[in-house]
Design a protein with these regions (language model features):
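Short hydrophobic/aromatic-enriched beta-strand-loop microsegments
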Residues: 25-29, 43-55, 97, 141-142, ...
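Glycine-rich nucleotide/cofactor/substrate-binding loop typically near the N-terminus or early
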Residues: 33-104
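N-terminal glycine-/serine-/threonine-rich phosphate-binding loop
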Residues: 1-51
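Internal alpha/beta core interface subdomains
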Residues: 15, 20, 91-232, 238-239, ...
Length: 408
């Protein structure tokens, strides 16, 4: 009988996945809340404690750290010595592992999270099982992301998970555990240094590829766009493209520059026909718009409405604004959208679009429309990392939170 070891915090798709494994003849090994969820769904589950013959100890801190578990994951099926040693120790192979980790990052981001709560959400057994299974991916299928359940199910139903897929899944495991450890390390350093820490001794950054670009800054250069995984600040990198052609390298540069300008004015929201900034400098009520072309601002202004702000920004230099990128600190309404579609623009960036405004913008087939979400989530106060084309180096400085006084 084949065995699948399942222990997850994120239970998305869990029951459906386990049902397929059961139908395919797998014995399900599990612990704690995962085992309960599967039993509640009517599935047969073998507790890891019963399988290993060792009870959970230390308030559940030690559940799966056992030779019968890790031997079943690490033993090479094609090595006669491993097979014989496993048999002599009563260790049976485990063919599939589905594990995801305690939600450490979500825990430390909760308001009021205590140090003790954070420590209890550092997973030990999960990363150990993932790493053992991933190391021996020649024999074991390991799944850390519930989004991969469907492709694994399809492969199993088609005769087995191919080595190429197992290798790709193993790669995802090491990427996941690497980021997990980096977040823990960063948290502990911040805790030990306290408020005095501005620049950590080490920076652990991870990015995921959003898209491959047609070319880079120049046509002879290749390019790709990446998103930082741990960022929370409203940003072009975390925006959703609602319409238009694929974003280019220079579109991203210009959109980012324009958005950073309007973020200087805080997040504006409708309030009784005017615009009220949720974090405006000196209490001034403003809508803000900025126009950037070739990474250079060619117009920026404030006004009582997004339309007013845009018209003022455009009138700063109408010729340069043609074919530019426009960003707002307020939701785009229909009057603003009509002004935007009256000329040629590459990209419009905003923290939201009214339905009628979006329909108006979609009349321009190629116009890229980017929704970056609420600017209230602006998490400024961290570090700005500067790539100054110094090979092997990054410069860092505290984020600029200075707000210049202004009037409408």
């Amino acid at each position: 009988m084949k065995r699948a070891l399942i222990s997850v915090s994120d239970k998305s798709g869990l029951v459906e996945f386990a049902k397929v494994l059961t139908e395919l003849g797998y014995e399900i090994l599990s612990t704690g809340g995962t085992a309960k969820a599967l039993r509640d769904a009517g599935l047969t589950v073998t507790d890891v404690a019963a399988y290993t013959g060792s009870p959970e100890i230390l308030d559940g801190r030690v559940k799966t750290l056992h030779p019968k578990i890790h031997g079943g994951l690490l033993g090479r099926r094609q090595d006669p010595r491993h097979v014989a040693e496993m048999a002599s120790q009563g260790i049976t192979p485990i063919e599939l592992v589905a594990v995801n980790l305690y939600p450490f990052e979500a825990t430390i981001n909760k308001p009021g999270c205590s140090f003790e709560e954070a420590m209890e959400n550092i997973d030990i057994g999960g990363p150990s099982m993932l790493r053992s299974a991933a190391k021996n991916h020649a024999d074991v299928t390991v799944v850390v992301d519930p989004a991969d359940y469907p492709q694994v199910v399809e492969a199993l139903r088609s005769g087995g998970v191919p080595l190429s897929m197992r290798q790709d899944l193993a790669r995802k495991v090491f990427q996941h555990t690497s980021r997990y450890d980096g977040i823990i390390s960063g948290y502990l350093e911040a805790q030990s240094a306290g408020a005095a820490m501005k620049f950590p001794s080490h920076l652990f950054l991870q990015f995921e590829k959003v898209q491959t670009l047609r070319y880079g800054e120049n046509p002879h250069q290749q390019g790709a766009f990446y998103r930082e995984l741990s960022g929370r600040e409203a940003a072009v990198a975390r925006g959703r493209q609602l319409h238009g052609k694929e974003m280019s390298y220079n579109n991203f540069l210009d959109a980012n520059a324009a958005l950073e300008v309007v973020k200087e004015f805080g997040a504006a929201q409708p309030q009784g026909g005017a615009i009220a900034a949720t974090s405006p400098p000196r209490g001034v009520t403003v809508a803000a718009a900025a126009i950037v072309k070739h990474n250079n601002p060619c117009g920026a202004a404030i006004g009582d409405t997004p339309r007013d702000a845009y018209m003022r920004a455009r009138d700063t230099d109408p010729i340069s604004a043609f074919g530019g990128v426009v960003a707002f600190n307020a939701k785009v309404d229909l009057p603003t959208a009509k002004e935007l579609t009256a000329t040629f623009l590459e990209v419009v960036v905003a923290p939201g679009f009214e339905e009628a405004a979006l329909a108006e913008l979609k009349r321009k087939k190629d116009l890229r429309v980017l929704d970056v979400g609420p600017l209230e989530a602006d998490g400024r106060g961290g570090l700005d990392l500067l790539d100054m084309n110094l090979l092997g180096n990054r410069r860092a400085q505290s984020a600029s939170t200075l707000r210049a006084p202004h009037t409408v």
